Amino acid sequence: MDNTNRPHLNLGTNDTRMAPNDRTYPTTPSTFPQPVFPGQQAGGSQQYNQAYAQSGNYYQQNHNDPNTGLAHQFAHQNIGSAGRASPYGSRGPSPAQRPRTSGNSGQQQTYGNYLSAPMPSNTQTEFAPAPERNPDKYGPNANNNQKKCSQLASDFFKDSVKRARERNQRQSEMEQKLGETNDARRRESIWSTAGRKEGQYLRFLRTKDKPENYQTIKIIGKGAFGEVKLVQKKADGKVYAMKSLIKTEMFKKDQLAHVRAERDILAESDSPWVVKLYTTFQDANFLYMLMEFLPGGDLMTMLIKYEIFSEDITRFYIAEIVLAIDAVHKLGFIHRDIKPDNILLDRGGHVKLTDFGLSTGFHKLHDNNYYTQLLQGKSNKPRDNRNSVAIDQINLTVSNRAQINDWRRSRRLMAYSTVGTPDYIAPEIFTGHGYSFDCDWWSLGTIMFECLVGWPPFCAEDSHDTYRKIVNWRHSLYFPDDITLGVDAENLIRSLICNTENRLGRGGAHEIKSHAFFRGVEFDSLRRIRAPFEPRLTSAIDTTYFPTDEIDQTDNATLLKAQQAARGAAAPAQQEESPELSLPFIGYTFKRFDNNFR
């Protein structure tokens, strides 16, 4: 076979003839055969190739033509097995199939209509019917597990995007610092410090925290759904306050939205007026919040110890509480549970807010129907015996401070119970008429009243009586005659404990700051001045200012293990978390960037 006329690339050397050799190459069609449709001449393409071969000398007559040689012989032989019957019936040749000819490519061929797909036979079904969906065969938790996986994936990408934005913001801040200095050593220090922190944070994200990493020193508080413990991290000895919440109680008492709201506000807040949250984690039974430990105790402990405050001391603490509430409002949240128990004092004696709506109050008892019946005098719930004095029946004066403190201690025990204390809650929350940010300013007024008078304005022996007094505040608000208050102090209290339309602070915290009672107060520098009370601490784990003697020191985890052992259930570490208890808490885990760098 002569290979001198094989096609080759046009590289400017087409006039150079390749040296012939004795190697044999396979022959293939130069162009893929085109289908021939009715009315089309099959020889048109071949005539074009012949004409092109004459002018360009790229083809020869009958060279690489499959109509000659073996291709022509095989076209007239049956070299396969017997054909099988098609379920679709008989059909014509495919349009892509080259027509079999006897070398006469100019012969006209006739074909059927190949533009419409062949239809299956009416007597035979093409596909078997699809089986009916039966998710129950996979177990009752199949749908919950599907939702859990979907939520996990969604939260994973949301957290990744959020961390990327925060990292870009930190990079912008670092570049700004680099641009403010020309000192090479200073720039190198800023760069290396930022890189080290980012690396530590990435490693911190990959670690899994658990309660076994911390040693419990003492239980410093208990609420309706959990407890707060003073703990020390075993790895580095740092001291924290660990709040643990029981998942089953959160689920039963409809507190799922509240627990997530508390986590979100503490995670988003970086204010000095709000307790700092470092990390959150969970296991099969508990939710854990690792927060900063504030050794000064709470404002209720100070009221029990000092009974009443002077107007100057009251002015200081109320001014700081105003800034703390305003910081929460700027984050878009309403605290709704401002009370002395939730106002903590740090090492310097300054105020910080904590416990965002979880420990007390907002569950079945806050149903609108309950208060409708209560206002109609249909309440038949028996009174609970909390060893309280009959404050509603006695005349509160300065001379019976012992009875007032007995009431305060009983009220603290009530705060530990599932009933909670309604003394500081605004009436619009009870009546269901809708409430806004100004409901926290009502609570501020009741706290100010207690600091100056010695008891809340609507306190009573029974919580139902307290509800009645709050709702009918116009008739029950009373200032004792034997206690002299300044004109500005009483005016501020009355401007806060009033209907929501006229309440001071409805337009913002600046309305309260500009009141005459705070004349001369520099709100911007409050945390830089010395507080009226500074805790005297002997160590980093000193709990002198917490009522630990009144709190049962048996933690909830120990009680849960004992209950499960009595039932013969698996240990908490070996339990598999059910979708009902895991699905609502997906995305609860949080790790602050500066957790390991304080």
Swiss-Prot record:
GO terms for molecular function: ATP binding; identical protein binding; protein serine kinase activity; protein serine/threonine kinase activity. Pfam families: Pkinase (PF00069). ATP binds at I220, G221, K222, G223, A224, F225, G226, E227, V228, K243. It catalyses: L-seryl-[protein] + ATP = O-phospho-L-seryl-[protein] + ADP + H(+); L-threonyl-[protein] + ATP = O-phospho-L-threonyl-[protein] + ADP + H(+). Keywords: ATP-binding, Kinase, Nucleotide-binding, Phosphoprotein, Serine/threonine-protein kinase, Transferase. InterPro entries: AGC-kinase_C (IPR000961), Kinase-like_dom_sf (IPR011009), Prot_kinase_dom (IPR000719), Protein_kinase_ATP_BS (IPR017441), Rho-assoc_Ser/Thr_Kinase (IPR050839), Ser/Thr_kinase_AS (IPR008271). Residues 1-46, 80-148, 163-190 are annotated as: Disordered. Residues 1-16, 24-33, 99-126 have a biased composition (Polar residues). Gene3D superfamilies: Phosphorylase Kinase, domain 1, Transferase(Phosphotransferase) domain 1. Belongs to the protein kinase superfamily. STE Ser/Thr protein kinase family. COT1 subfamily. Protein kinase required for hyphal elongation. This is Serine/threonine-protein kinase cot-1. It comes from Neurospora crassa (strain ATCC 24698 / 74-OR23-1A / CBS 708.71 / DSM 1257 / FGSC 987). The lineage of its organism: Eukaryota, Fungi, Dikarya, Ascomycota, Pezizomycotina. The gene is cot-1.
